[in-house]
């Protein structure tokens, strides 16, 4: 780890872990006309990659059918006049050009007018959350009053494309030590985190089993029903239930799974890593004053978003830097946060971030995370927003965060209303 990164880390972590409730918390709870608020946030079920309900459809189909359901549930003033939506941003990772053409087409087919501009975004695993930030920033600076953030991914149909996560063609870059680190497989970066920071296989399997147990319990209790919209498939069947969670998963049952990336001594397995998945999610945002004028419901409030860069070879540590940065930007501390939705790309990297920041495990992913639910890359950040707004209670504060391939981290803060 570079000296500069260590210095930044020390400053941010010390700031984030200060003692006592921050002075800024009460002021953040005050409602202002210029606030960016969330009017609606929903998602599809998450389908298992290559064999799940969405295996035979691609992202254009998923997005179009999701939008039909999502728009159909918009508050009447918006549903009656979609011209009020002034911008659409859609996160996606694996499609060529982040799906700029097919996802714009899906928006038009769903009734969003051609006069509403569209932008395709790809910041790898944070793409869905980056779309939320893109719309929020445009509202903040006065470019728009209402916007729609989306995230969609079909890992089934696009993950096996030639070089789906990019390539380096320049011979000069191929010889450059730092540049080559961007091509390190994600599983190997997680092995680096586990080895460098001494995250044991046992701890990883226990964390993963806990994720499965929480997700299966939440699914059985119907806690996801309010956030999941049904997707009608070409054969007429309906998918509206997550396919990843399963019963009777224990650390012991996971311990028998072989390492996936480093034979014999590796600790990363299919059981303690996120699932390859397909899914779509959407977040509708507005300026509070406009939402009030239109009598739109307010689920929560967007507060801030921050990203950081970290060494690509240990990219999973990203949230350990992004979370302190967004907390510092808002004057908050770790203990001010009621729930953390930290994407479980891998158990080792999630555990490192949780331990480094001194986060109470009971506050992390109370309904399970990507290990149990799945991680459709471009969808995940938007999905996490839909989830955390159901987990939080009135006036509680939540953080959504994830690591990002090639060495980054992102984090955002939301308040429930």
From Swiss-Prot:
Q: What does this protein do?
A: Responsible for the thiolytic cleavage of straight chain 3-keto fatty acyl-CoAs (3-oxoacyl-CoAs).
Q: Where is this region: PTS2-type peroxisomal targeting signal?
A: 1-15
- Catalytic EC class: transferase
Q: Which organism is it from?
A: Saccharomyces cerevisiae (strain ATCC 204508 / S288c)
Looking up InterPro entries in the UniProt record yields: Thiolase, Thiolase-like, Thiolase-like_sf_Thiolase, Thiolase_acyl_enz_int_AS, Thiolase_AS, Thiolase_C, Thiolase_CS, Thiolase_N
What GO CC annotations are associated with the protein? mitochondrial intermembrane space; peroxisomal matrix; peroxisome
SUPFAM superfamilies registered for this protein in UniProt: Thiolase-like
Q: What is this protein called?
A: 3-ketoacyl-CoA thiolase, peroxisomal
Q: Which GO terms describe its molecular function?
A: acetyl-CoA C-acyltransferase activity; mRNA binding
């Amino acid at each position: 780890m570079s000296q500069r990164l260590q210095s930044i880390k020390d400053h941010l972590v010390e700031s984030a872990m200060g003692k006592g409730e921050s002075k800024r918390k009460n002021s953040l709870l005050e409602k202002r006309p210029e606030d960016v608020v969330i009017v609606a946030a929903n998602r599809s079920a998450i389908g298992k990659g290559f064999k799940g309900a969405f295996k035979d459809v691609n992202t254009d189909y998923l997005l179009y059918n999701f939008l039909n359901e999502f728009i159909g549930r918009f508050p009447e003033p918006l549903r009656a006049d979609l011209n009020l939506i002034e911008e659409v941003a859609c996160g996606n990772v694996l499609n060529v050009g982040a799906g700029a053409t097919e996802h714009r087409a899906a928006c038009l087919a769903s009734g969003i007018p051609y006069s509403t501009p569209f932008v395709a975004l790809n910041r790898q695993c944070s793409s869905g959350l980056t779309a939320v930030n893109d719309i929020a920033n445009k509202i903040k600076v006065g470019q728009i009053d209402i916007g729609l953030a989306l995230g969609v991914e079909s890992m089934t149909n696009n993950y096996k494309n030639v070089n789906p996560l990019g390539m380096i063609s320049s011979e000069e870059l191929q010889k450059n030590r730092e540049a080559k680190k961007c091509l390190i497989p994600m599983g190997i970066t997680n092995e680096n985190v586990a080895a460098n920071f001494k995250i044991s296989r046992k701890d990883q399997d226990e964390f993963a089993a806990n994720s499965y147990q929480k997700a299966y319990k939440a699914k059985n209790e119907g806690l996801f029903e309010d956030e999941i919209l049904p997707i009608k498939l070409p054969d007429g069947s309906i998918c509206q239930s997550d396919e990843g969670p399963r019963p009777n998963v224990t650390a012991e049952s996971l311990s028998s799974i072989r390492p996936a990336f480093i034979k014999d001594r590796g600790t990363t397995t299919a059981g303690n890593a996120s699932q390859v998945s397909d899914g779509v999610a959407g977040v509708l945002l507005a300026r509070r004053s406009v939402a009030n004028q239109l009598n739109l419901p307010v689920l929560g409030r967007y507060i801030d978003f921050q990203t950081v860069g970290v060494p690509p070879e240990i990219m999973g540590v990203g949230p350990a830097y992004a979370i302190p940065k967004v907390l510092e930007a808002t004057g908050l501390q770790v203990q001010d946060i009621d729930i953390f939705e930290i994407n479980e790309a891998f158990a080792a990297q999630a555990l490192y971030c949780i331990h480094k920041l001194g986060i109470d495990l009971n506050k992390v992913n109370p309904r399970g995370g990507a290990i149990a639910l799945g991680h459709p890359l471009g969808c995940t950040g938007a999905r996490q927003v839909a989830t955390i707004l159901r987990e939080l209670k009135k006036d509680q504060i939540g953080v959504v965060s994830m690591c990002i391939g090639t060495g980054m981290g992102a984090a955002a803060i939301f308040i429930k209303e």
